Amino acid sequence: MITLYLDMDGVLADFNKEYMKLDPNKTDRKRFRSAVIEDKIFEKLDFMPDAAELLNHVSRLNGINIEILTSMGTHDPFQGNAAKMQKLNWLKAKNIPYKANFVREKKEKAQYATPTSILIDDSSGCVIPFHAAGGHGILHINAADTIRTLDNTILQINSLQALSK
């Protein structure tokens, strides 16, 4: 069975829009920590402009296991747990029913790569390692292109599986 992993920030949720509202005088690391711990940024995020189109499409895929694969952006357990809880709250508030998987940093998403797994992510720092580890990575720029590439990738995986039987 094919597993489709959807990234949250930059694919479903508009992290940058909210992050840019925060104190630009703090260093990036302190600014991010403050955004998570004090501002609970991950609970405040809007949908990406075309997230509904992508979510609607994937919800109609038959025989595909759909999950969330998102980074907490830190190795700090306290900050990581805060990010995880906020992201879970966001998914619940937005009625996104998929199982959520969390990694500490981008490159760890490659641990989920298999020949029958697909990652949709807006960061090449996630897609390239995922692909190198044997999975199928789709660099998300907009829903229309991602949907086209996703459908082709699913056909490709299914064709390879049929040939190997």
Positions of predicted regions on the chain:
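Active-site neighborhood of HAD-like aspartate-dependent phosphohydrolases
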Residues: 1-43, 142
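Substrate-recognition element of Asp-dependent hydrolases with the DxDx(T/V) motif
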Residues: 46-47, 51-84, 91
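A short, conserved beta-to-alpha structural element at the edge of catalytic cores
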Residues: 34-43, 138-139, 143-158
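Conserved Lys-Pro-Asp/Glu-containing loop-to-beta segment of HAD-superfamily phosphomonoesterases
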Residues: 3, 101-130
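Short hydrophobic segments within beta-strands
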Residues: 7, 69-71, 120
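Acidic, Mg2+-coordinating phosphoryl-transfer loop and its flanking beta/alpha structural elements
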Residues: 118-151
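Short, solvent-exposed loop/turn segments at secondary-structure junctions
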Residues: 11-13, 18-19, 71-75, 106-109, ...
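Structural recognition of alpha->loop->beta junctions
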Residues: 86-101, 155-163
